[in-house]
Amino acid sequence: MDAAFKKSFAPEPLAVTDPVPKYTGLAPETTAFDIDGVIADTMRLFVDIARESFRIDHLRYEDITSYNLEECLDIAPAVIDAIIQQIIAGTHAPQLHAIAGCCQTMARFGRNGHPVRFVTARPEADVIRTWLENTLPLGAGQIEVVATGSFDAKATVLRSEGIHIFVEDRLETCFLLSQAGITPILFAQPWNRSPHPFREVSSWEEIASLLAE
């Protein structure tokens, strides 16, 4: 989930015509991560806010089958917008949690003190950077966050940073990254279950098994 995650601005997935770049393992020098839906359990926070602030008790995590929330949820668009604004601004009462296993794997990933890079389509980085600093077991100054404000801008940022591998939960973004020569790893979620040609992980334990030694 990212800045405008209730709408999907990317084009329909295109067939990948070029071979996927060779996968060589995850290392801080060449690997970066999306935040919402990969590090942060943001869609579960969406469900919690809907229940606690708007008394929407029927919504389940598994009901979120599209990044365009208006397509898959029987909730008024104004309520969806209000929940999203709470998430982006960090004004929500329920707590935003890390996805299970993330913290342990991040401790290993950043153990040598290298910067760990995160790229999000949120419109600004301050709120989520503070959350990352308070949540992840990384050293002071290791966390680097770029907020692009759009899904389409991720590839440009990643290429400029020398990133070759990106862990992402939005399938449309994976297609865009692949077309730009970046190897996406799809973090499996209910909203990305369409067919795709990419490497996929369903847990942080799987990501841990892919780390470069």
List PLM regions with ranges.
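Short glycine/proline- and acidic residue-enriched helix-loop micro-motifs
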Residues: 83-91
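Short catalytic/ligand-binding loop motif for oxyanion handling, primarily in non-cytosolic enzymes
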Residues: 40-42, 47-48, 125-128, 155, ...
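Active-site neighborhood of HAD-like aspartate-dependent phosphohydrolases
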Residues: 6-84
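Substrate-recognition element of Asp-dependent hydrolases with the DxDx(T/V) motif
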Residues: 91-98, 102-132, 147-148
